Amino acid sequence: VKRLSIIAGLILLLLLSAPVIALFTLGHSEAALRYVVAQLPTKAGSLEKLQIDNVRGTLAGGFTVERIVIEHDLVYLRIDGIRARLELLPLLWQTIDVSDFEVRDLEIAPQPRNQPPPTIARPFLPRLLTLEARQTRVRSATIRQSTGSPVIFKEVTAHGTIRERRIWIRDAKGSLGNIALEANGILKAAMPLGLEAQAKATFASRRGPRWVARVNTDGDLENLPLEGGLLEPFVADLDAASLRALPPWNLRGAAKVSKLDFTRFGGSAFFGDIAGTLALDFDSTGYRAIGALESPGLDAGPIDVEFDGTFARNTLRARTLKLAHAPSRLRIDTSGTVTFEDAGPALALSGRWQNFRWPLLGDDTALQSERGLFTLEGVGNYDIRTEAALRIGTLPLMRTVIDGSLQPGRFVFTDSRFDFLKGTSLFSGELGWRPDLSWKITGRIKD
């Protein structure tokens, strides 16, 4: 009996140690790893293609994969330059614990659905299986759209946990051009997929104010209600805004603008805190906003605003920016680019105005111009050039060309030309508003 007990104990010990031995062998053998990868199915259900190229190393000691290509009925993924290491012991309790996971390039692109859509929510992993991804880093992640420019994120880091019906993303950080991003969220297996997330975006340059936006959401990818908005350098609170995160994506809603103070940008305090409401309509073809803003300093009622543009690779491109004041018939049309650089926003704008008068309201007109052209270019100190037909009070019409520099707290102009009657005047000078209003002008007049 004693001998049988010993034999039974040895057999039990061998049975219990067999998984550990097999796991140890798999974890430290490159040949075993390649064999397991070769046995993976290349197609399964909605997975149309799985391709894994050039696997080297071991699970426990660290391994590399040259490329993984995944083609799903809705999305295409290509992952290049993979490096990772697995902790072996957690595999015994059905946990895949990945550490030091790094990807050189990740590309995601939508694909037209070629299979019937699922009727029930599919789990992310088999029941009781857990995947832990620690110290995850993606050097470059590109999201391509069916239309429009791709979105490229750099140096993305995060911690993640995947279970049967939940994916947790913690402490995600990265950059979109010069915009720093932070996010936390939970993706939920549902029809459609559910998402609970918090995100923050920050742009800080050497010149100019800091830009900060925060957004929270809790919904599904068909309809994600958005709360939050822009916090600095002015406030733009989202109102009744929602995002469709599935292709074709779109964002609809409104932004309630307040505390827009030009002194934050080096401008004059004359305009006061500008406020108003803009209707938002964003999608892959562009970003559109329409509404009205009001300046207490102008005291002229609302000014209609219309914007249509795109954003890609650090550059906001204004196809058109229109400002209109119905009572005075003033209209300003602008187009060009704003590029977010380390030194500050770089402007390259041009436009025209019609029916400008000052003041905007009232019977007495000190200055008026039926039409004119302008350009605004530079970083920090912005070069301005205007060409216009100008009338001051009751004086005859004059032709003007003004070249100047808009700097924090002042406007400096040099050799600006005024053609009046049969003579020409050349003026240089400075108009300042910080800390106090000041001005000086020098010039000469010639026949």
Task: List each language-model region with its residue ranges.
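Structural motif
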Residues: L59-A60, R163, D220, D281-D283, ...
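Amphipathic hydrophobic-ligand
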Residues: D73-L86, N114-P116, T147-H159, S175-N184, ...
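N-terminal type II signal-anchor transmembrane helix
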Residues: V1-S46, V75
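Solvent-exposed beta-strand/coil patches in large extracellular/periplasmic or lumenal scaffold regions
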Residues: Q51, I68, P118-A172, P225-E227, ...
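A short, amphipathic edge element
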Residues: A44-D53, D273, S369
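Small-residue helix/turn framework positions
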Residues: G62, R67-V69, S99-A109, R134-R139, ...
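Flexible beta-edge/linker motif
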Residues: N54-I143, W168-A172
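N-linked glycosylation sequons
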Residues: K256, D281-D283, R288, F356, ...
